[in-house]
């Protein structure tokens, strides 16, 4: 029987790394236009999905603005405010969206050192693997200003990873983020299925004529670590929801996932249990760099606290919906 995209498949269960390659540079997405690939992937399984009701929208303009939520005064991830000796924990400020993505919203006194180490690890890995060329191209202001790196590795391998280094002025920067099936917590999608639906793209500056000067006829997007990417989206949603909802009113369903260290290559088959996209809810054109919208997700006579996270909304990237807990 032919397999349909969206069907459970033990052979791919736990796959962490995905990328998209261009073997024909004439097929690159048009400059400055949202696109998607692959376009000929065949039939896919449609799942019943929940309904999101937005209650409050937080927008992030292209120019970074420093803002603060109320101090949390305990670790937003593990819930602790004291160590094993009963002494007050040292708590640091938690950026809702990583500062390197040009966002300035912080929650003071919200992360213990142990949890901060884990979140910093997956945020730092994603910066290097996915976001650094985008940060440079858009001149996003991070903690130390605009990224100073001037050369980035370009994957030119067909079957295996093979890197070439190209000056940033000619580096073919194409933003690639996964479009997901609905999360299993608010849809009929099987819990053991973790493939992306497709990839949403935005060509920032990839010019076939320029690439030919480097004798390149093929290249790939950065490999997306789906586990760490899901951790990032869940962390953004969880931190903002913890500020919006009174902590005593809901029980988090993603905090343990966020503060679990998944070393590179380690399997994980539950990272998309609470993180996904909605097919029946179309994303509108947006002038905002990023968006966070808090609300509820209704599914099977249940209403769950949920958050919509949309990074690079102005580039047409998808919204991710996270069920962050239960009331």
Per-segment meaning from a language model:
Residues 1-70:
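N-terminal alpha-helical interaction blocks
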Residues 59-72, 81, 101-106:
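Short, flexible, mixed-charge glycine/proline-rich loop motifs
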Residues 75-78, 112-115:
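Short cysteine-rich clusters marking metal-coordination/redox-active sites
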Residues 82-108:
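Histidine-centered nuclease catalytic patch
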Residues 99-114, 133-147:
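Short microdomains enriched in Cys/His and/or Lys/Arg
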Residues 119-157, 161:
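Polybasic, low-complexity binding patches
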Residues 154-185:
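Short flanking/linker segments adjacent to small metal-binding domains or redox-active Cys/His motifs
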Residues 185-327:
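C-terminal, charged low-complexity interaction regions
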């Amino acid at each position: 029987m032919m397999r349909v995209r969206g069907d459970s498949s033990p052979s791919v269960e736990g796959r962490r790394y995905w990328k998209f390659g261009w073997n024909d540079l004439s097929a690159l997405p048009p400059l400055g236009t949202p696109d998607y690939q692959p376009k000929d992937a065949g039939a896919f399984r449609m799942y019943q999905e929940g309904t999101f009701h937005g209650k409050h929208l937080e927008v992030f303009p292209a120019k970074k603005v420093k803002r603060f939520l109320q101090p949390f005064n305990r670790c937003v991830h593990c819930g602790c405010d004291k160590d094993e000796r009963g002494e007050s924990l040292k708590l640091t400020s938690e950026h809702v969206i990583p500062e390197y993505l040009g966002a300035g919203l912080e929650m003071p006194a919200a992360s213990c050192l142990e949890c901060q180490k884990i979140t910093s690890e997956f945020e730092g890995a994603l910066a290097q693997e996915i976001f650094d060329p985008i940060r440079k191209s858009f001149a996003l202001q991070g903690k130390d200003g605009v990224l100073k790196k001037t050369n980035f590795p370009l994957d030119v391998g067909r079957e295996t990873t093979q890197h070439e280094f190209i000056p940033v002025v000619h580096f073919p920067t194409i933003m690639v983020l996964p479009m997901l099936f609905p999360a299993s917590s608010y849809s009929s999608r099987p819990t053991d299925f973790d493939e992306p639906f497709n990839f949403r793209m935005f060509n920032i500056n990839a010019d076939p004529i320029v690439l030919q000067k480097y004798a390149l006829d093929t290249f790939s997007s950065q490999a997306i670590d789906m586990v760490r990417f899901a951790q990032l989206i869940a962390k953004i949603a969880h931190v903002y929801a913890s500020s919006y909802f009174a902590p005593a009113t809901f029980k988090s369903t993603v905090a343990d996932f966020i503060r679990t260290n998944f070393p590179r290559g380690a399997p994980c088959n539950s990272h998309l249990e609470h993180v996904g996209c909605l097919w029946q809810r179309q994303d509108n054109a947006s002038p905002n760099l990023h968006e966070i919208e808090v609300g509820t997700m209704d599914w099977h006579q249940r209403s769950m606290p949920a958050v919509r996270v949309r990074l690079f909304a102005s580039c047409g990237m998808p919204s991710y919906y996270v069920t962050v807990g239960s009331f």
